[in-house]
């Protein structure tokens, strides 16, 4: 029965439709895997919710076999612990919200559950989505299913959606919800050898998603194939009047556009992404995939995105400033942790000192400094101006090209026991942050293995609201590259 865990979402759906196996059988084998997992990917398990969804799915499939049944009906999924789930603990992996149980459902998880998906539980993450390795969780780090060949060293899964990526790579679930602020879906997907996609900013509602940086936060998905990502994205995207930034643009059936035809498409390669610190192995695969796309009929051209070098400092200034504002609500008064004290101000201070982890405190301090009266113009306003320039670089580039091909991360995953400097950690996001600042859709696709036997990935960036075309290009890359997803013994 463990073979069921290795099926794609589409294969699971076909098996359920043909009654080759029941949804209850499918879910039970995944529940058993989750109960025995050693990756620390799941922090809250919801087997009762999953079995209930499976029984409902079996009833639907026994009564109806037409195309009106959702492709996610009865499919085992995980939800990043950043999305509020009604009646199920939602912590953002912080001591501050250790015992918080929401009274409402986030829009994207609600859409997923209404499609019939079976939620196996809530997934580990960096605290309040602040991190690039999933080592900043109150509930402990997540382990990657892949290990270094030379020494058997465990490696990080990436972050902040490390639990989402590790659970999918480890065949604990077929797909997972994640969030992407500066690359938190794409970078862990790259490290874990799976597919991670974020849509255009505004495609998915942010209602019920615990805020980190509101102008950057966007829901995304992690799966084991591009076609599976398309199925999940078309389920969770759509207008929501509860989110003022939600787009009213119609959402096409993304999966219908995956046909492998990219003839005449212009693919841009930005020269600024060939920077110091990028591994030779990444460069090799970048050039190889570019050549493959040419053979498939695409035109590959050099482009320039001149303000790329400012993306990392601009991103960390803006996201830290927004985080300092968003996290001001955690004061021990309304909900979450409270540390009692005789004086109100002391209660605020003690609560936040105990409730927040080191990385969250660091970013709050950076953000508060950037927003302070003496530095607002010097830092925050300038960062917003340069963000506009970065966005304009992309707009100008897309006047002449259709898609952009860049690495997802500069290197393979680093060791779990390594303790890199926070500044070094920032560099891990160097290739994902620009698309986030511009609000563009992007997808990370595994393209091969390093000499250490660890996954390497490239990223396709699409124009605004062109997720369908982006997914199609990604599917061609996926087909051209040898399949690297396997259970790592």
UniProtKB/Swiss-Prot annotation:
Keywords carried by this UniProt record: ATP-binding, Ligase, Nucleotide-binding, Protein biosynthesis
Pfam family, one: Amidase
Gene Ontology, cellular component aspect: glutamyl-tRNA(Gln) amidotransferase complex
Keyword Ligase set for record: yes
Location of the active site: 80 (charge relay system), 160 (charge relay system), 184 (acyl-ester intermediate)
Reactions catalysed: L-glutamyl-tRNA(Gln) + L-glutamine + ATP + H2O = L-glutaminyl-tRNA(Gln) + L-glutamate + ADP + phosphate + H(+)
Subunit structure: Heterotrimer of A, B and C subunits.
NCBIfam families referenced in this protein's UniProt entry, alphabetically: gatA
Free-text function comment from the UniProt entry: Allows the formation of correctly charged Gln-tRNA(Gln) through the transamidation of misacylated Glu-tRNA(Gln) in organisms which lack glutaminyl-tRNA synthetase. The reaction takes place in the presence of glutamine and ATP through an activated gamma-phospho-Glu-tRNA(Gln).
Stated name of the protein: Glutamyl-tRNA(Gln) amidotransferase subunit A
Organism lineage string: Bacteria, Pseudomonadati, Pseudomonadota, Alphaproteobacteria, Rickettsiales
Gene coding for it: gatA
